[in-house]
Regions:
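Asp-based, Mg2+/Mn2+-dependent phosphohydrolase catalytic module
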Residues: 3, 9-11, 21-22, 26-121
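Conserved phosphate-coupling serine/threonine residues in phosphotransfer and NTP-handling enzymes
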Residues: 17-19
Length: 121
């Protein structure tokens, strides 16, 4: 799914996380995805304000030289969804079963998916 998004977006994808950069990079390396995001990782720890504020998403959009309204945010928490919505982005939520979808939709997610194979633009 990440490779598909990377190709579809011509490499213009980023990670915007509330976690610290070291942890994010470590996780991406462990799962073999670091190459898709090299130089495009943004941490809330490095922003004036972290989620639920939109700063990390706004920084990622600015780096990609795109309007946040043209960005798709993929989130798994209500705090992250709130941040994505505040940035003006379209937000989709990932919820591993048996997670409840209602809180994610109430926070502003436009769509909830339960498996990465469902992630198609």
């Amino acid at each position: 799914a990440v490779a598909h998004l990377h190709d579809h977006c011509e490499g213009r994808i980023a990670v915007a996380s509330g976690a610290d950069r070291f942890k994010v990079e470590m996780m991406l390396r462990q799962v073999g995805l670091m190459g898709f995001f090299e130089g495009r990782i943004f941490s809330g720890h490095e922003m004036p304000r972290s989620k639920p504020h939109p700063d990390v998403y706004l920084a990622a959009a600015a780096h990609l030289k795109t309007d946040p309204a043209r960005c798709l945010v993929i989130e798994d928490t209500t705090v992250g969804i709130t941040a994505g919505v505040a940035a003006g982005a379209t937000v989709w939520a990932y919820a591993a079963p048996p997670a409840e979808h209602a809180p994610l939709l109430q926070a502003g997610a436009q769509r909830v998916f339960t498996g990465m194979q469902q992630l198609r633009l």
